[in-house]
Amino acid sequence: ELDYHALSFHASDPDLDSAGVELKSGQKVLKELEEIFPEMVLVDSNHGSMKYRKAKVNGIPRELMVSYNVACGVGEGWTWFNNFTTKMADGRELFMTHGMTKNGVQLAREMGMCVIQGHYHTEFNIQYCGNPNVLNWSMMVGCLINNRSMAFAYNKTFPARPILGCGLI
């Protein structure tokens, strides 16, 4: 997804790209990814939803907004969902979300199924929880943030650092 640093509700760094420049450069990267992955299911995030949240706070109806596919410059093969549940190879359900709680295994307990989530830059793990009927797991996939980027400079005030990661099922 795109970071949308320049659209953030937080103060933007004047030495970083404007929203338009950031969008154009992001579209190029997403187009490259689309060539590799022409069909993808993605979950909405606090970054991807930025254009909608900024429009809402400024009184702009969603009908005046272009779709996220158009904004990102990708085709209809990419589909975004608020959250997504699918069946795994063993027939069990898997719940995917951008981020609901930092405690992923607790989310697996609450959902009653295995879960995958991101958002929490400093969390990368797989944890298990079980009961007499089922063994579920939670996968926290870290992030793909560039810790040296000026857009992530706010992190320098925290002791924890992002963990680069990716999950594969």
Describe each model-derived feature in a short phrase.
Residues 1-74:
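Core catalytic region of metal-dependent phosphoesterases/phosphodiesterases
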Residues 27-29, 80-85, 100-105:
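A generic local structural motif
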Residues 40, 77-79, 94:
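Short, conserved active-site loop motifs that form the nucleotide-linked donor/cofactor pocket
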Residues 43-45, 81-83, 97-99, 141:
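Conserved beta-strand termini and adjacent loop/short-helix elements that scaffold enzyme active sites
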